[in-house]
Amino acid sequence: MRTNVGEDFARALASKDSARMRELFADQIDFQALTPGRHWQASTPEKAVDDIILGVWFGPQDDIHELRSVTCGQVRDRERVTYRLGVKRNNTEYVVEQHAYYESDGTHITWIRILCSGYRPESME
């Protein structure tokens, strides 16, 4: 079964595969994202992956233990991927969902906008 670049990105993120994520981004990428309380920008794969995605959002202390869902689609000429992750941080279970709209050359993501739900507690007790 062939996956698209967006699904490949979601799977690489879920496994925290930094090399694969950098490989999926074009050398010059227009990366912007919105998380609760902050706007992020990067123009290189290293900045986007190492400094932002795996440097802050899902750092070494965060265990992404499950890719709960991934869906892909298109909005005219723009691709879309939505993924939901199960993450353990500081001994607490969370759900994190992100929606990404992106453009690619078929192999590399050249433009991406990500919107993140933030870390939502698994249990609302």
Each model region followed by its residue ranges:
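Charged, low-complexity, helix/coiled-coil-prone segments
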Residues: 1, 38-46, 95-100
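Hydrophobic pocket/interface hotspot
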Residues: 9, 21-22, 29, 48-49, ...
